[in-house]
């Protein structure tokens, strides 16, 4: 893809759904997701995912800790850059980080959005100032109301955060949080029993990547942060 002469681009990820790059134009730095390089069989799905992410980011405008939507033209999505390190690298152990992350999830819920992919550590950032941020809204759930389905998805977002807290800061878990961790929804049970296996098979066989953190095993995608990731 052609770039403006004034732009400096660093490739962050390239796969069958297109490519993602960090762009510097003058003093501005942003992230660009380009679906035009997607495999032709998957180009429609790639555009749908990018369009859905644009809708989610538009819903969340102004929330600190979420990328801000800059542009979506039907093929290319541009969003603001957030400096920080992914959870699996930063391994946050400060209880305050988890309280702030809980408030961030609550802010998403108040806008009628559930992230749906917070089990993946690369989707969490520890920013340079030590506060949390959330990335990758391609499969978020956008709701007009607060029905039972939405409430369940929002609880799953929180439960995934608590699982990360159990990994990196277990001594700070409260009795209420421990009880919530034990209360898996029927959706979580079904996903673990069937859906996760199917997803892992497809990710490995078709796209060449998967690990327990949602990271890639393919050489086409290397670990990054928002100095950084996607």
Positions of PLM-derived features:
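Conserved structural core of kinase catalytic domains
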Residues: 46-51, 55-104
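C-lobe/activation-segment region of protein kinase-like
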Residues: 127-230
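Catalytic-loop of the protein kinase fold
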Residues: 110-127
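A short acidic, helix-capping loop that chelates divalent metal ions and anchors anionic groups
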Residues: 39-43, 88-89, 143-145
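Hydrophobic core positions within the conserved protein kinase catalytic domain
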Residues: 57, 105-109, 122
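Short, glycine/acidic-enriched loop or turn micro-motifs at the edges of active sites
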Residues: 83, 120, 139
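ATP-binding glycine-rich loop module of kinase domains
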Residues: 5-58
């Amino acid at each position: 893809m052609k770039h403006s002469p004034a732009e400096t681009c660093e490739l962050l990820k390239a796969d069958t759904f297109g490519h993602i790059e960090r762009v510097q134009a003058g003093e501005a730095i942003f992230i660009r997701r380009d679906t035009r390089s997607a495999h032709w069989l998957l180009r429609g799905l790639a555009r749908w995912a990018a369009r859905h992410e644009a809708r989610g980011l538009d819903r969340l405008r102004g929330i600190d800790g979420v990328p801000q939507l800059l542009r979506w033209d039907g093929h290319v999505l541009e969003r603001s850059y957030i400096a920080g390190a992914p959870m699996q690298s930063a391994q946050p152990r400060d209880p305050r980080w988890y309280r702030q992350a809980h408030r961030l999830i609550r802010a998403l819920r108040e806008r009628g959005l559930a992230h749906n992919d917070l089990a993946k550590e690369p989707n969490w950032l520890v920013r340079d100032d030590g506060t949390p941020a959330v990335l990758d809204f391609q499969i978020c759930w956008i709701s007009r109301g607060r029905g039972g389905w939405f409430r369940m998805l929002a609880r799953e977002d929180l439960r995934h955060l608590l699982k990360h807290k159990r990994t990196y800061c277990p001594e700070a878990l409260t009795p209420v949080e421990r009880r919530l961790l034990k209360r898996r929804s029927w959706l979580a049970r079904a996903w673990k029993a069937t859906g996760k296996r199917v997803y892992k098979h497809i990710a490995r066989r078709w796209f060449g990547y998967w690990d327990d953190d949602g990271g890639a095993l393919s050489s086409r995608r290397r670990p990054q942060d928002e100095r950084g990731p996607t």
